[in-house]
Amino acid sequence: MKINIILLFVGLILAFAVLSNAISIKNDGGVNPFDNNNSGSGSGSGSGGGSSSSGSGTGQSSGTVSSSGSASNNTSSGSQSGNASSGSSSGSSSGSSSGSSSGSSSGSQSGNASSGSSSSGSSGSQSGNASSGTSSGSSSSSGSSQSGNASSGPSSGTTSSSGSSQSESSQSGNASSGPSSGTTSSSGSSQSESSQSESSQSGSASSGPSSGTTSSSGSSQSDSSSFTTTGSQGSSGSSGSSQSDSSSFTTTGSGSGSSQDSMSGSDSMSGSDSMSGSDSMSGSSFTGGNSGGSTSTGSGSYSGNPSLTGSSEYSSSSSGGGSGSHGGSSSHPNGWTDVGQFLLGLAEGLVSTVASNTKLCFQSVGSSITDFENAFQLIDSGFSRLSKPLIEQGLMDLGSGLLEVAIAFETCNVQNLASEIKALATNIESGELGILEVIVKETINIFHNGNQLTTEFKLTISDYKSQNYLGMGYNIGGIVGILLKD
């Protein structure tokens, strides 16, 4: 019973002390902590610990200030809040900061509380007791960001904060400005350098003592071309064209009859000319027997690298003694022309063996490989520049070149391959889709029905650059063989 009386007495004393303190504060112009009708505004900010926080409050408020976290008068970890006689600021603030706040204030200090330590050296409270928004004391905060709103009322004292706030904004988007350097590939364009072949057209015809006429007509694409007839009776005519470095035809002796020498289209020599013996050509040879009713003594020789358009047939009926030979020399192995080597290589790339008479015809057929040279110059540039249009233009030139090959094969009686190559060449030249497909990714590849032909094309380019016409033709023959299979 005595204990209860003592406790009641102590409680009355404490209540009286609190009431006296409140009255004293009111008389001093302060704020009654139990008066909820006071109005005021307050705002504050705090930062630190590498994170940013912001908060603001204005206007009238009543009640208590609340925020995320709690704080006592001395030390808080979270946001500082407390009892407000003037009310709580409308708004909210949250966040955390590392640092310290020290000093004494009877004003409002609402905002973000530090997660460090807070010390107070006054008997007042540091938790937002403000009527007019006045604040005295000092508050310091350190951290890595500064944010918040200042108080709406005057403040006596200092508030300092140290820290830094950094924000990095990334700009995303597409920027295209200024010139760009590098490789620019053109689409829809083609570049080609065409090689022009130089040829001289010259020809001469001379006749020695002869009771007859000798005529020579046609064109000769060569350095020199001469036809000489001596000591013969009758008439001889020569028409056609020859592509060679040098050629000469000589007949000596006596004979009678007539001969027609046609070297354009289908080449035939028929008549009763006195030539008996064997005719041979370097690389391949052919022989013919001569019999007839005329006699001739002497020798006939033919030297050089002729290039004839057509097949050659030699028929004669004469009697007598003599010999004729085909031979000569040039800058190519075995006396072969560029075209002859190319056609031979292409045929060997398609079939296992080539007949000797076909080889002879290839050696003398008049054709051109200019389209092939243009084609692989463009294809080479397309590989280097990753340009699909250049390669496609080169493939069209390849088709044009194959049309020339088909004509040469027809001339040399390779009819079965000639018709197939002609049909294929027409499709390639027209750019028909599906024959050859050009795919551009990191590199360029050429396909036909799933079969990659890139390696074959690059080997052909290498042979073209080194002027290996036999190898160039062989690789093209391999490509054509694959295309003809399907």
Curated annotation (Swiss-Prot):
CDD domains: SctA-like (cd22935). Residues 61-318 have a biased composition (Low complexity). It is found in: Secreted. Residues 41-60 have a biased composition (Gly residues). GO terms for cellular component: extracellular region. Glycans are attached at residues 37, 73-74, 83, 112, 129, 149, 174. Residues 1-22 form the signal peptide. Its main location: secreted. Residues 30-332 are annotated as: Disordered. Keywords: Glycoprotein, Secreted, Signal. Belongs to the Sct family. This is Secreted protein C. It comes from Dictyostelium discoideum (Social amoeba).
